[in-house]
Structures are given as structure tokens and as C-alpha cells.
């Protein structure tokens, strides 16, 4: 009986975590090896857009459900950027653009991610060229994409 109860609680926790995920389904899947991701994106004429989020973040949820749900924004983002999501409390292993390996949460600290959502746009060498923190309304998001493309 204890095993069944423990399994039920574990499954309930996984379901709750999945519902709390503030990442759009159209974001790229990545092995989080950013030297390779930057190179591949550049080969396609794109740049990386890193999206730092956390479960239970109201601004992350609003960004996902409004701005990142607009078809024109999805299309424009995917045309010029490769969006990759990172959990500020995450344990996944990441290889940063300088070759160092760390956990998602350590990378967030390294990049001074202090609030969520945080969007970081990288140039074709992997350097951060633009940062946006907090909810970004659709009009401002479009302007942000244009600015990141110009830099």
C-alpha cells in the first residue's frame, strides 16, 4: 500500500510540474551545448534566444499565454531565432559558449538572471547582445526582435 501511495504522490507531483511549465511548446529542443547551438543557428542565419523561466512565475505564464501565443510573433521568432528555454532552478547540465559546463541554475547566476522571465539574445559568437527582463507585451516583443536582429 505504501508503494502505491508513494507512486500516486510522485505522479501527482509530475502532473503538477507539467501544468506549471511556462515554456511554449514550439521552443527548440536542445542538448544545451551552446557552442554547437550557436554555430548551428548561425549556419541557418539565426541567433539564439535564451528564455529563463521558473515554475509558478505569473509573468512567465502571461508571456507564454499572450505574447508567445501570437502566430505572427511565433513565426517571426522562429524565422530569425532559435528559442531555448532554461529553468533558473534547473539541474540540467549546460555547456556555455566558452566551453565551461554547469547546471542551468548556475548559468542563470553566471549571467546575472535576477528575475523571470529573462530573455537573452546571443550574437553569432555566443555573446549576449540584448537582455529583456519581465513580461514583454506583443508590440514591445516585436520591437525587441527587430533590435536583436539589427545588433
Spans of model-derived segments:
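Sec-dependent signal peptide recognition
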Residues: 1-7
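Typically the conserved alpha-helix immediately C-terminal to a functionally engaged Cys/Sec
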Residues: 60-78
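Boundary of Sec targeting at the N-terminus
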Residues: 19-21
